[in-house]
Amino acid sequence: IPDSIFEIAQGAFAESPKLTVLTVSENNRWYVSIDNVLYDAEKTTLLAFAGGNALSEFTVPNTVTLLGRQAFAGAVNLRCVTLGATIKDYGTGTFSSCSALESVILEDETLRVIPEDFFNGCISLHDFSMPPAVERIGARAFQLCSALESITLPRTLTELGDNAFGKCQKLKEIAVPDSVKTMGESVFTGCDHMQSASLPKSMTVLPADTFSFCYALH
């Protein structure tokens, strides 16, 4: 990235799995790259993790308060990420299509929103502890997390977006807490191995395709 660039839009390098090197000119006043990870000059925003970066484990620096849209999207070698409590804002699709990602440690227990497409397509993700204060899970947040076997939804949760857990093929059971007031369509569609599910007692409408193609549900 030359020194003339003063604005890089979020998602500019998303889904680029063969991008192994991401460097910034030393004379650029607005951006910096460390280990092929792109930040703003103050290192408060992480904009892009090179899709072909060889790192398999990564801890986001504690200076970072914002993860840009699709910041890690398509990072094919990444297996484990630690997200510190300093991060207060997440863009959509943060980890979409991180096919090798197995676990994410999220240290901020006050996080209220899991954004849209947060883990969409993370086919190896099997370990994620939902923060206890989460109120909304965005559309497709866990879609195609086909290795995820269990997830506990907190009692603070009020909204589940469309296809939030669509095609989580190994998810065996789910308990939607009574706090949930809004559910989108196809929330659990294609969860092949789901055997049991419980819904809020106050629920009056079951949205379209909520449990469609859940062949093991009984």
Where do the protein language model's features map onto the residues?
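Consensus positions within tandem repeat domains that build extended binding/scaffold surfaces
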Residues: 10-12, 47-48, 68-71, 91-94, ...
